Amino acid sequence: MANVVVVGAQWGDEGKGKVVDIYTEFADDVVRYQGGNNAGHTLVVGDEKIVLHLIPSGILHKGKRCIIGNGVVLDPEVFIREITNLKAKGKFQDDGVLLLSESLHIIMPYHKRIDIAREAKSGAKKIGTTGRGIGPAYEDKIGRRGIRLMDLLDKQVFTRKLKESLEEKNFLLEKMLGEKPFSFEEIFDEYSAFADTLRTYVADTTLVLHQDLKAGKKLLFEGAQGTLLDVDHGTYPYVTSSSTCAGGACTGTGASPRDINEIIGISKAYVTRVGSGPFPTELEDADGEKLRQTGGEFGATTGRPRRCGWFDALVIKYAVRVNGLTGIALTKLDVLSDFETIKICTGYSYNGKFLSELPANLDIFEKCQPVYEEMPGWQTDITAARSFDDLPEKARTYVKRLEELAGCPIVLVSVGPRRDQTIMLKNPFEA
């Protein structure tokens, strides 16, 4: 038996969707453990591109149980729209394989309005939020005033909690943010209708997980965003509002740390970031634009162009450390195929000092300059490679150098967006 956690090892958008899609073949359950619809997983199935924001990627595989855990914040409208779209495409028909934790928190309309209004007032201090209400929903969760799915399903409880919440939220919207307040009726009627649809999928998912673990089933835990966006371990305050690291797989589902066997970090062969915050290897030149266009680096959720830069070994070393990575899945190696020279950041220069580890102090991090090592590019198409030996020697040398710098084995190399454009060096489910 092997249970595997998949985490982003950079700032998100590393290609987790494709890797999870591949690993799902070997799992019985696929479990989403944090975040909300601020994340977008892009999958290419045949010639069709499918983008999922909430539902685990495993939904595209027949016979796999998909669970959205208690660590997720759920926008009911988005969830229902995803189900409807998947059913219309013939990708999902069995409601019994999709479960929602009764304990997860619900994103309300006022969360979204507050999110957008705050960002608009932030000026130069913008975080780069997606405006989906994720942060305000987690605020209510931590403040012990959130509305959970089990509350939404009980009209009496929902009525009481919504009235209490609106009293506070409308004051905030009107008096502090200058925004229009909400009426009780408009939210209650809309969300009561959502509840009727959601009821089909609700379960005590922690109990289900432990029953499946006891039965010897294999679990795949699917994270969203990336390590450097973790609320505790990321580049705070330029982070998301949940625990994106491997530890979140336990707190966000009810699984025990003893149940986790392998932790795979997903990393691009270069680096991207969306929104504000430090990014030492960012390229604001022709090379950066080339990475963006060749890699299709535009957000699956927002459509925003991603900031692009060279591979940063310090970021990956940090991800290995705080997640306890047992392997790295390297994605988008093919995007580098047209570069004559490829750079790797092996350290930072700060005030005349050489830094070999990621600084925790944001003021220092923002002033760090990358120290590069240059490697020759392979300048040939690698999308047909299906084994490591199929890669050009210079591409193999590049991968081995990244592995050496990370201090963690690379267990998968992706050379294109399709499922079959993958070189699996080691299967974590067979470890």
UniProtKB/Swiss-Prot annotation:
Its main location: cytoplasm. Pathway: Purine metabolism; AMP biosynthesis via de novo pathway; AMP from IMP: step 1/2. Mg(2+) binds at residues 13, 40. Substrate binds at residues 300-306. GO terms for molecular function: adenylosuccinate synthase activity; GTP binding; magnesium ion binding. GTP binds at residues 12-18, 40-42, 306, 332-334, 414-416. One of its GO terms (biological process) is IMP metabolic process. Its EC number is 6.3.4.4. It is found in: Cytoplasm. The active site is at residues 13, 41. It catalyses: IMP + L-aspartate + GTP = N(6)-(1,2-dicarboxyethyl)-AMP + GDP + phosphate + 2 H(+). Keywords: Cytoplasm, GTP-binding, Ligase, Magnesium, Metal-binding, Nucleotide-binding, Purine biosynthesis. IMP binds at residues 13-16, 38-41, 130, 144, 225, 240, 304. Binds 1 Mg(2+) ion per subunit. GO terms for cellular component: cytoplasm. InterPro entries: Adenylosuccin_syn_GTP-bd, Adenylosuccin_syn_Lys_AS, Adenylosuccinate_synth_dom1, Adenylosuccinate_synth_dom2, Adenylosuccinate_synth_dom3, Adenylosuccinate_synthetase, P-loop_NTPase. Its cofactor is Mg(2+). PROSITE patterns: ADENYLOSUCCIN_SYN_1, ADENYLOSUCCIN_SYN_2. Belongs to the adenylosuccinate synthetase family. NCBIfam families: PRK01117.1, purA. Plays an important role in the de novo pathway of purine nucleotide biosynthesis. Catalyzes the first committed step in the biosynthesis of AMP from IMP. Homodimer. This is Adenylosuccinate synthetase. It comes from Geotalea daltonii (strain DSM 22248 / JCM 15807 / FRC-32). The lineage of its organism: Bacteria, Pseudomonadati, Thermodesulfobacteriota, Desulfuromonadia, Geobacterales. The gene is purA.
